Design a protein with these regions (language model features):
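Extracellular glycan-associated modules
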Residues: 1-275
Length: 275
């Protein structure tokens, strides 16, 4: 009788040990799986949708992001995934001090950023010939977007007027389904343009603040090799700009007071404009 009790106790302990071992093994497996997912998302995600300016800099600070992966410090921009035609997205935050003006050059537009060659036209202030895309600030307080296509170098131009000053606001340039170029301001679609042809992407560098740049600041410049979703856009607006200074300057726009532009500015006076 005593032997049977001892045998049952040993068997019972063995079952408990097996159960505990199984639970521990499952826990370790889940932790390893989560670690692998984190590593994959972190490193693959950064290379696919890099943040070129992870902070805030003055708009007149020239920055060049090399696309040659053999160059130390380069941030290569991957081409569109092409699942539904050429699709990609650029997002950035801007704080504009004033409209485009001449700064010792015969320029009319101020350069914010573009992807392509280094060939600013001294008369117009616009890069020639490659803008894929290009974002500029006009003397009329307008944002101007250029997008090269295979059939037209400068025929696809989008203008967004009445841009506010002294407030941080988000700009998204999204190309989807090959021919549709959308411009969002603070998550609201303010301009839709049907491209005249297939977008002409290039292997050129990304330039910020060429030819004296613009009067203001830029933050959180980011690229996606796809057309981001509305949820992605809302998340970008929710996260806001990264206001960490990347350079030393005397600007006070990095203060925490009134740094974001209210969506009411667009909802009350601007409806989407479809071209």
């Amino acid at each position: 009788m005593a032997n049977e009790i001892v045998s049952e106790f040993v068997n019972s302990n063995s079952k408990v040990d097996i159960m505990l071992f199984f639970i521990l093994a499952c826990f370790i497996f889940v932790m390893i799986l989560r670690l692998l997912i984190y590593i994959t998302v972190t490193y693959a995600g950064v290379s696919n949708s890099p943040i070129l300016i992870n902070g805030a800099v003055n708009g007149n600070n020239l920055r060049v992001f090399e696309q040659d992966p053999s160059v130390k410090g380069s941030i290569p921009i991957k081409r569109s995934t092409n699942k539904d035609g050429i699709s990609f997205t650029w997002s950035t935050w801007l704080n504009i001090d004033g409209p485009g003006t001449t700064q010792g050059y015969f320029t009319s537009d101020q350069h914010i950023f573009h992807k392509g060659n280094n060939g600013i036209d001294p008369i117009t202030g616009v890069n020639i010939p490659h803008n894929a895309p290009g974002l500029y600030l006009s003397p009329n307080n307008e944002l101007v977007v250029y997008m090269n296509t295979f059939d037209s170098i400068d025929g696809n131009k989008v203008v967004i007027g009445n841009i506010p000053r002294g407030k941080w606001f988000n700009v998204i340039i999204r190309v989807s389904e090959q021919y549709t170029l959308d411009v969002y301001i603070n998550g609201k679609l303010v301009k839709r343009h049907i491209l005249s042809g297939i977008p002409k992407q290039n292997y050129g560098n990304v330039y910020v603040g060429l030819n004296g740049g613009f009067s203001g600041s830029i933050s959180s410049l980011r690229y996606y090799p796809r057309a981001i979703s509305n949820i992605d856009i809302l998340n970008l607006i929710r996260d806001g700009p990264n206001l960490k200074r990347l350079t030393v300057d005397n600007s006070n726009i990095f203060s925490k007071g009134e740094q974001y532009l209210s969506l009411q500015w667009f909802l009350s006076s601007h409806s989407p404009d479809y071209l």
